[in-house]
From Swiss-Prot:
GO terms for molecular function: 3'-tRNA processing endoribonuclease activity; zinc ion binding. It comes from Haloferax volcanii (strain ATCC 29605 / DSM 3757 / JCM 8879 / NBRC 14742 / NCIMB 2012 / VKM B-1768 / DS2). Binds 2 Zn(2+) ions. Belongs to the RNase Z family. Optimum pH is 5.5. It catalyses: Endonucleolytic cleavage of RNA, removing extra 3' nucleotides from tRNA precursor, generating 3' termini of tRNAs. A 3'-hydroxy group is left at the tRNA terminus and a 5'-phosphoryl group is left at the trailer molecule. Keywords: Endonuclease, Hydrolase, Metal-binding, Nuclease, tRNA processing, Zinc. The keyword Ribonucleoprotein does not apply. This is Ribonuclease Z.
Length: 317
């Protein structure tokens, strides 16, 4: 099952010519989940070819660079004759403000939009085989991060063992792999556990939004396939990071290291690094020795299963 992440906006509070405000989209086998919606997000979606079929929008907090794209997105979806509903999720206390954005200027969308508040530790959205969980973050206003966590997958099916046990090739293989026991014509029962290995973990993608480095992020991001973490400043602005409740690249890298994530994306890059963001990555790599990169607008990333190959970062343009 495919999973592709697209960085639509990787800038800080002040956009630059190269970086739009925060927006991050995950396409999981055709279902599109949007995390934050800064100004111009709908144009970024057009520019980078993600499509508009977003089913859920997960808002981390109510600062403008994370939400002011909502009115434009809603109206663009409506003008494109959208029929499907859209669910918007936000931190405690956000519902009224988010509803105002949906109806900015008295606008009444022609499709259903629902707004929900989610508390840290709760599930914002549950699908058949994955869920999106909210977790604690620390910013200057009510905020949450989100973790997309897939269910475990069935273990590997041992076809050779099944044939040795007399299981005929065909539908019985699928039933065994799905966890059912199978009775053969001679009355012998072949148990699923005899031919199926241990469950294999699904994928986890963690998106923090704006935050200080926290143990709660380490816990939820443990062994994650991708961590997208606030890395607004370099060490030289560490005091400012504390004052504004952001993270430095080094602090974010410590979270990535302690959580032992497979890949780590630095985002929410301050405009002061517009000419050269390389110091952020250099400082992060002094702490975290895994695959780390400064996310760029339009960058696309395949998120493979941990037991498969491939999945490196791509550039969108």
């Amino acid at each position: 099952m495919s999973m592709r992440a697209t960085f639509l906006g990787t800038g800080g509070a002040v956009p630059t010519t190269a970086r739009a405000p925060s927006a991050f989209l995950v396409n999981r086998d055709g279902e599109r989940l949007l995390f934050d919606c800064g100004e111009g997000t709908q144009r970024q979606m057009m520019r980078y070819g993600t499509g508009f079929g977003v089913s859920h929008l997960f808002v981390t907090h109510l600062h403008g660079d994370h939400i002011l794209g909502i009115p434009g997105l809603i109206q663009t979806l409506d003008f494109n004759d959208r029929d499907d509903s859209l669910a918007i999720h936000g931190p405690p206390g956000s519902k009224g403000h988010l509803e105002q954005l949906v109806h900015a200027g008295g606008y009444q969308p022609g499709f259903h939009v629902s707004v929900h508040e989610v508390r840290p530790g709760n599930v914002a959205y549950r699908a058949d085989d994955y869920e999106v969980r909210a977790f604690d973050t620390e910013h200057r206003t009510a905020s949450v991060g989100y973790a997309l966590v897939e269910d475990d997958r069935p273990g590997r099916f041992d076809r050779e063992k099944a044939e040795e046990l007399g299981v005929p090739v065909g539908p019985a293989f699928g039933r065994l792999h799905a966890g059912e026991d199978v009775e053969l014509e001679d009355g012998t029962v072949v148990r699923s556990e005899q031919v199926v290995g241990d469950p294999r973990p699904g994928r986890t993608v963690v998106y923090t939004g704006d935050t200080r480095p926290l143990n709660s992020t380490v816990e939820v991001a443990c062994d994650a396939d991708l961590l997208v973490h606030d890395a607004t400043f370099t060490d030289e602005e560490a005091e400012r990071a504390k004052q504004t409740a952001h993270s430095t690249a080094r602090e974010a890298a410590r979270v990535a290291r302690d959580a032992d994530v497979r890949r780590f994306a630095l985002t929410h890059i301050s405009a002061r690094y517009a000419a050269d963001p390389s110091p952020l990555l250099e400082q992060a790599r002094e702490v975290y020795d895994g695959e780390a990169f400064v996310a760029e607008d339009g960058q696309k990333l395949e998120v493979p299963y941990a037991d498969s190959d491939g999945g490196g970062a791509e550039t969108g343009e």
